[in-house]
Amino acid sequence: MAYPERSLIVDPRSGFCKSNSTFYSKRQPLSLPPNLSRDVTTFISSQPHRGKTAFIDAATGQCLTFSDLWRAVDRVADCLYHEVGIRRGDVVLILSPNSIFIPVVCLSVMSLGAVFTTANTLNTSGEISKQIADSNPTLVFTTRQLAPKLPVAISVVLTDDEVYQELTSAIRVVGILSEMVKKEPSGQRVRDRVNQDDTAMMLYSSGTTGPSKGVISSHRNLTAHVARFISDNLKRDDIFICTVPMFHTYGLLTFAMGTVALGSTVVILRRFQLHDMMDAVEKHRATALALAPPVLVAMINDADLIKAKYDLSSLKTVRCGGAPLSKEVTEGFLEKYPTVDILQGYALTESNGGGAFTNSAEESRRYGTAGTLTSDVEARIVDPNTGRFMGINQTGELWLKGPSISKGYFKNQEATNETINLEGWLKTGDLCYIDEDGFLFVVDRLKELIKYKGYQVPPAELEALLITHPDILDAAVIPFPDKEAGQYPMAYVVRKHESNLSEKQVIDFISKQVAPYKKIRKVSFINSIPKTASGKTLRKDLIKLATSKL
């Protein structure tokens, strides 16, 4: 265990220091590069390993060796700089299903000092347009199928091999990725100098009020994540199956950066299908899966069929994040798959992988825990009402601090000030406690995001749409528990007098305006929405009302 000040007295068991009410990580400290002009792509490429195959496309079998990967990164970066004109600080959007070339694009863009951002492929054209208006990308990497969702006249590089003529003339295609990968570099190596404090990545994190916000992550933030990833007890010869979306922080940090530095092989599924995943495990003798909790539940429910059809003897580890696993789910999985270890973790988009995780099956059997603090992370538990710092086994809002914590929100200083204080503490919005052994437990969400199958759904966005309906006076959206999805959006609606508005009409009204994962799936009508004196919706009262009928 390492501490920032020698004078601190820290309990070696819990990691807690009474003098400053701070919990410290019990893991080994990170070794970060002192060179302030070393970008994260260079840091990743400099890591020694003996890995040969970096990525495999599960659908086609196409492979990228590590030599192929770094050759492609160099060539794409050269094309972007000399032919497209991408420069330091420019924003490049990736709108694409999972692909073995997403890591190539991310690493190329960051090597130039440019910033990559992503969008959910399920989002509507309206939702994507709002994000584009905020981030103002210079260029978009996308597929022929997804290109029509983009605003007209935006520059596009196609990530598939479809011909130009199949696209509407309003879309300005400036390149095809497969051609960029084949093109020999120009030999002109002059590029903009990159500083570690420069922004490298901007992922959009949904908020409970107003529009989603672009989370700004620097080269230093991502370097800290990669350094932590390779320092964890991971086997370099692991073969991972990537089922999580690579437009999300989990997929990007793990499979576009972490495993590349580690030298592991990753088999990428373009989209998740349970039996496609199992087929990939058997075919490629995969040893590790990274999953969201609903997939774990599906594996339990279909265990007999899965084990009868597929050889999963190579599978050793399942890594699960997004929500704490219950004792019932953990025990149910271990009963069905006794030779597979479950490892859990906790992090936020704003923490870039910093948070907590379990690194052994024994730790994961401490039911409900997200693990112990990751390397170089400090934590505080704060009373959300008084602001008082709490101690061991006391519940309050979790604050995190460390080298991977985001710089803040893009063009939103107010939100940045509310979330990250002047000392660099990230207020997570999650109600947690840390026990006498330093294990973090997530009790509840102070933040009101609904997590549907790993996707974040902001209630305020759906409420804003609901009240535009001519027959709706007021509305509130809450998370409704579901065994398969984790949660789904449920609406409480106040109808106008004499209105005969039905549940189906409300559901249909919303479904036409949002991505599939944001759809409202249950509606209840109510006389009034319970609110505080200041007008804030009392969601907990509505959640209690909804779940009391279960």
Curated annotation (Swiss-Prot):
Q: Which amino acid positions bind CoA, per UniProt? A: 271, 453-454
Family annotation (Pfam families): AMP-binding (PF00501), AMP-binding_C (PF13193)
Gene3D superfamilies reported for this sequence: 3.30.300.30, N-terminal domain of ligase-like
Required co-factors: Mg(2+)
Q: Where is this region: SBD1?
A: 273-344
EC number, UniProt record: 6.2.1.-
The region called SBD2 is annotated at 345-409
Binding-site residues, ATP: 205-209, 213, 344-345, 349, 430, 445, 536
List the Gene Ontology MF annotations in alphabetical order: ATP binding; CoA-ligase activity
Q: Where along the sequence does the record place the motif called Microbody targeting signal?
A: 548-550
Checking PROSITE patterns in the record gives: AMP_BINDING
Q: Which UniProt keywords apply?
A: ATP-binding, Ligase, Magnesium, Nucleotide-binding, Peroxisome
Q: Which reaction does it catalyse?
A: OPC-6 + ATP + CoA = OPC-6-CoA + AMP + diphosphate
- From the Swiss-Prot or TrEMBL record, state where the protein is found: Peroxisome
Q: What class of enzyme is it?
A: ligase
- Summarize tissue expression: Expressed at very low level in leaves.
What is the top-level taxon of the source organism?
A: Eukaryota
**Entry GO terms, CC:** peroxisome
Q: Which InterPro entries match?
A: AMP-bd_C (IPR025110), AMP-bd_C_sf (IPR045851), AMP-binding_CS (IPR020845), AMP-dep_synth/lig_dom (IPR000873), ANL_N_sf (IPR042099)
CDD domains named in the record: 4CL (cd05904)
Q: What is known of its domains?
A: Both substrate-binding domains (SBD1 and SBD2) are involved in the substrate recognition, and are sufficient to confer the substrate specificity.
Family membership noted in the UniProt record? Belongs to the ATP-dependent AMP-binding enzyme family.
What function does this protein fulfil? Contributes to jasmonic acid biosynthesis by initiating the beta-oxidative chain shortening of its precursors. Acyl-coenzyme A synthetase which exhibits a high activity specifically toward OPC-6 ((9R,13R)-1a,1b-dinor-10,11-dihydro-12-oxo-15-phytoenoate). Also capable of activating sinapic acid, a cinnamic acid derivative. Follows a two-step reaction mechanism, wherein the carboxylate substrate first undergoes adenylation by ATP, followed by a thioesterification in the presence of CoA to yield the final CoA thioester.
> What protein does this entry describe?
OPC-6:CoA ligase
Organism per entry: Arabidopsis thaliana
